[in-house]
């Protein structure tokens, strides 16, 4: 496709002479076929089109000129007429015929381009087709193309020779470097072997000369090893003892610190004494000592009034009672205390109010139980009435049932 486009662009819009156009196409195909590198570069395509255009113009002018000479000396034609006669016959046509031919060629130019891209040159002279290979076989363009091919081949051969020379030189350099490395390695190995041999000889001679000295050294080394092992064992035992003693000391210190803290708390409590709130919340009876604090504010001063003795006897009875449930044997003493409180309402007004408040719900409970209890007499009367009614109903039924 690329070559066909180049041929069309090079040979289009030229003077409408079929012979010149056919030569232009033929020469462009020969040039492209002879140059293998054609089409790789856009610059080459442009130059080829420009050259083909110039050649087509030159051919057209040559065929239009009256005194023309043959274009190629070695041209051959199969027909009886020579190329010059055919061209002269085509050139000596009348101007009217030339105009007609020009108009026809312009109209059918594109069709001829598409038909004659591969094999035919396109022009018809006297009804005979001139083949592209027969119009010009040994032209100057072919010679130039061959020279270009030769020059490119020479360049390729020169480059290949240079590359082969470079490769040979690099291979030689690598070989020499490898040989030098091998020589250096062998020399180093030989030196090491000689040094090892000398050391072995010196060691053998020293052993032969001083066997007793070597035995002494061995015994000394063994003693030193034993000493080091014993020292290590002693150090481990000491470290274990230290750790045990440290742990014991830490435990003792912790215990002593706890005891000291408790003692300090007790001393502070004794010095500070109980606060008013603590005294109020504490009970009158101390279970540790088994004594009763009659001055305790929780008793409300009842132990020091006119009924103090009755209160003390009742309270101590409740505290020291061993009966279960506790306080059953102290009920009578408690009743005597309440009777004493009623004699002195001025001193025990609050206590009497509390006892009255406690007795009211008890009285209400008793009343409710009495009211809720069924009346035995009324129940008996109701039962008798029901029995009489049932007897009355049965008697008429029995009378009706008799015949």
From Swiss-Prot:
Cu(2+) or Zn(2+). GO terms for biological process: protein folding; protein import into mitochondrial intermembrane space. Residues 33-46 are mitochondrial matrix. A motif (Cx9C motif 1) lies at residues 307-317. Residues 1-31 form a transit peptide. GO terms for molecular function: 2 iron, 2 sulfur cluster binding; oxidoreductase activity; protein disulfide isomerase activity; protein-disulfide reductase activity; thiol oxidase activity. It is found in: Mitochondrion inner membrane. Disulfide bonds join 296-298, 307-340, 317-330. Residues 75-84, 101-118, 147-168, 206-230, 262-271, 382-403 have a biased composition (Basic and acidic residues). PROSITE patterns: CHCH. One of its GO terms (cellular component) is mitochondrial inner membrane. The chain crosses the membrane at residues 47-66. It is a single-pass type II membrane protein. Keywords: Disulfide bond, Membrane, Mitochondrion, Mitochondrion inner membrane, Oxidoreductase, Protein transport, Redox-active center, Signal-anchor, Transit peptide, Translocation, Transmembrane, Transmembrane helix, Transport. Its main location: mitochondrion. Residues 369-378 have a biased composition (Polar residues). A motif (Cx9C motif 2) lies at residues 330-340. Residues 67-403 are mitochondrial intermembrane. The keyword ATP-binding does not apply. It comes from the Eukaryota. Monomer. Interacts with the FAD-linked sulfhydryl oxidase ERV1 and with the substrate proteins COX17, TIM9, and TIM13, forming transient intermolecular disulfide bridges. Interacts with FCJ1. Present with 5040 molecules/cell in log phase SD medium. PANTHER family: COILED-COIL-HELIX-COILED-COIL-HELIX DOMAIN CONTAINING 4 (PTHR21622:SF0). The CHCH domain contains a conserved twin Cys-X(9)-Cys motif which is required for import and stability of MIA40 in mitochondria. Required for the import and folding of small cysteine-containing proteins (small Tim) in the mitochondrial intermembrane space (IMS). Forms a redox cycle with ERV1 that involves a disulfide relay system. Precursor proteins to be imported into the IMS are translocated in their reduced form into the mitochondria. The oxidized form of MIA40 forms a transient intermolecular disulfide bridge with the reduced precursor protein, resulting in oxidation of the precursor protein that now contains an intramolecular disulfide bond and is able to undergo folding in the IMS. This is Mitochondrial intermembrane space import and assembly protein 40. It comes from Saccharomyces cerevisiae (strain ATCC 204508 / S288c) (Baker's yeast). The lineage of its organism: Eukaryota, Fungi, Dikarya, Ascomycota, Saccharomycotina.
């Amino acid at each position: 496709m690329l070559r066909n486009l180049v041929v069309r662009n090079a040979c289009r819009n030229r003077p409408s002479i079929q012979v010149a156009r056919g030569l232009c196409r033929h020469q462009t195909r020969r040039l492209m076929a002879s140059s293998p590198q054609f089409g790789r570069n856009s610059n080459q395509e442009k130059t080829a089109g420009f050259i083909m255009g110039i050649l087509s113009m030159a051919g057209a002018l040559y065929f239009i000129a009256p005194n023309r000479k043959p274009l190629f000396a070695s041209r051959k034609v199969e027909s009886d007429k020579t190329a010059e006669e055919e061209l002269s016959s085509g050139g000596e046509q009348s101007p009217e015929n030339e105009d007609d031919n020009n108009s026809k060629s312009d109209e059918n130019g594109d069709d001829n381009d598409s038909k004659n891209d591969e094999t035919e040159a396109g022009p018809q002279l006297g009804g005979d087709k001139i083949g592209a290979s027969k119009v010009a076989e040994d032209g100057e363009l072919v010679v130039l193309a061959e020279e270009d091919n030769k020059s490119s081949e020479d360049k390729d051969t020169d480059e290949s020779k240079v590359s082969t020379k470079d490769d040979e030189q690099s291979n030689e350099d690598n070989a020499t470097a490898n040989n030098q490395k091998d020589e250096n390695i062998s020399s180093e190995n030989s030196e090491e072997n000689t040094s090892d041999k000398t050391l072995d000889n010196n060691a053998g001679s020293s052993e032969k000369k001083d066997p007793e000295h070597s035995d002494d050294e061995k015994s000394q080394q063994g003693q030193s090893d034993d000493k080091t092992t014993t020292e290590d064992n002693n150090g481990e035992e000491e470290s274990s003892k230290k750790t045990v003693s440290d742990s014991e000391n830490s435990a003792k210190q912790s215990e002593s610190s706890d005891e000291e803290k408790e003692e300090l708390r007790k001393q502070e409590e004794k010095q500070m004494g109980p606060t008013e709130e603590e005294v109020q919340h504490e009970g009158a009876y101390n279970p540790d000592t088994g004594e009763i604090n009659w001055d305790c504010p929780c008793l409300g001063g009842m132990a020091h009034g006119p009924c103090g003795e009755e209160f003390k006897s009742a309270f101590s009875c409740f505290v020291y009672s061993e009966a279960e449930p506790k306080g059953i044997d102290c009920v009578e003493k408690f009743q005597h205390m309440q009777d004493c409180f009623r004699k002195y309402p001025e001193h025990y007004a609050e206590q009497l109010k509390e006892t009255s408040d406690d007795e009211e719900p008890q009285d209400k409970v008793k009343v409710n139980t009495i009211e809720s209890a069924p009346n035995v007499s009324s129940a008996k009367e109701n039962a008798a009435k029901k029995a009489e009614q049932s007897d009355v109903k049965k008697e008429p039924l029995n009378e009706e049932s008799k015949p």
